[in-house]
């Protein structure tokens, strides 16, 4: 007997969402971002469904190697680059693309004897202030790399800090202006990649040669004022479970740790096999939406490690074994995230390894 919690992964929804991205970016190539185990959806399952993408972006060298060994021949980009000379050897061997964002990485690169043709993404810090060379350093770094290997393929890259916020267009435009002013954008017409999911949707002028969609591929919105459904996307992950017990409450009965929820009338509650050890947000408050038998209801009381409780008043047919949707089909993950005062990215990527993940189509 297995606990009934499951993450159902709809691979046709992945393909649909990729087609939505293509409809927004008809000329740009698509670098599908599959870091963090494809945002919790499973790396190989996701890349197989997205096999028509023009490239993939990951964080760890191990994930990039896994894609190569699975037979993917598209460019595979390491978003944080490399951390040692040994990793550069592996990048060479597996013909991977790599970001370079620091002088430490540049020094390692220049000391490396590479046999294949290098594919470098030169990251420029235009205002995110996280990774990247300052704009005034770009020409120097570019020239050092070309002196090292004149046949090096170099793509210029930056990342927007506020593309999701409609009130921050000035910041986006300021970053875009800094990028456009780079010496080698003007002089050498280098390939460029700027747009993340939010910029793909809000700023078509940023699409350039490569776009880097992430959250939109998984059916969730990068925009705070819209859900994925409203953007024409389909949810890929549906987190489901079942009711495993029912309790009848009298007025003034309290529920869960701390007794924070107090019944103000006779009511039935269902105990659901899902908790924070499964990746459900512990701080989700009473009132967070849940579906039971496809009907909308609410969480009541605190989330426990392995269980949570839901209001069954008005759902008279619900009982032990009734299906519960925690997010996904019929219940946008953005709604749950907003109630828990977090973001959909965190919910999807925080799914626990103990939750079985099942492909559906």
Swiss-Prot record:
What biological-process GO terms show up in the record? D-alanine biosynthetic process
**GO (cellular component) term, any one:** cytosol
Residues binding substrate: 130, 305
**For this protein, what reaction is catalysed?**
L-alanine = D-alanine
Cofactor(s) named in the record: pyridoxal 5'-phosphate
Q: Which GO terms describe its molecular function?
A: alanine racemase activity; pyridoxal phosphate binding
Which pathway is it part of? Answer: Amino-acid biosynthesis; D-alanine biosynthesis; D-alanine from L-alanine: step 1/1
Q: What are the catalytic residues? A: 35, 257
Record-linked InterPro entries: Ala_racemase (IPR000821), Ala_racemase/Decarboxylase_C (IPR009006), Ala_racemase_C (IPR011079), Ala_racemase_N (IPR001608), Ala_racemase_pyridoxalP-BS (IPR020622), PLP-binding_barrel (IPR029066)
Is Isomerase one of the keywords?
yes
Keyword set, alphabetical order: Isomerase, Pyridoxal phosphate
Q: Name positions with the PTM N6-(pyridoxal phosphate)lysine.
A: 35
Asked if the record carries the keyword Isomerase, the reply is yes
State the similarity comment: Belongs to the alanine racemase family.
What job does the chain carry out? Answer: Catalyzes the interconversion of L-alanine and D-alanine. May also act on other amino acids.
> Which protein are we looking at?
Alanine racemase
